[in-house]
Amino acid sequence: SAWSIGVFPIDVRQGSLVTLLTVGIPVILLAIWARPGYRYHQTLVRRLLHFVLPASILASLIGLGVFYGPLFFQLTPAVKALSAEEFLAEFVGIIRINQSGLSAFLVVVGLLLLPFVEPPTAWWVGADRLSGDWRPTWLAVGLGCVYIAVMLTPLRDFFDLAPLTLPHAAFAGGSALLWLFLVRLAWRRRLLERFFGVEPSTDAQ
């Protein structure tokens, strides 16, 4: 949803970085690290309801707030105080920094999924069984460091990202923490399965 709403909250270059860090690299390494042996199986519907939909719906809804919330408070006074030409010049910079805030949120959320895929401790159990495998968690930490390095170097301009102000960074980080606890609650309580009347799998954790 972040690709298709309003004034394009995230552009292609920003989206490519988000996808690389949260999908491209993790998918390859998780496939390499996959352990042979018994894995419980769920139908596609069960898997969508339990894992995919809660994470994506919450990320989409909170992401809308991450982008449009600050945008509203920044643009409202600018409309009243600036001429049309000044407003257009200001608008470009405001959009870019809010796109960067949303990109940060999506990266953090995507990386927070990795410990849930292979829970290293009981706290992370919700989307899958306890595995005790710390490699995906350390991968998330490493990719988070890569993202920080991008934001602190000229690579930031290559991906069309703006430096985040402290309020923007705090808002994006706080929103990611909100997503973390809400999605964990949704997984553990199986809220979507209950809403749609789907019985839990006997093989589920």
Where are these regions (language model features)?
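Extracellular/periplasmic helix-loop-helix junctions in multi-pass membrane proteins
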Residues: V150-A170
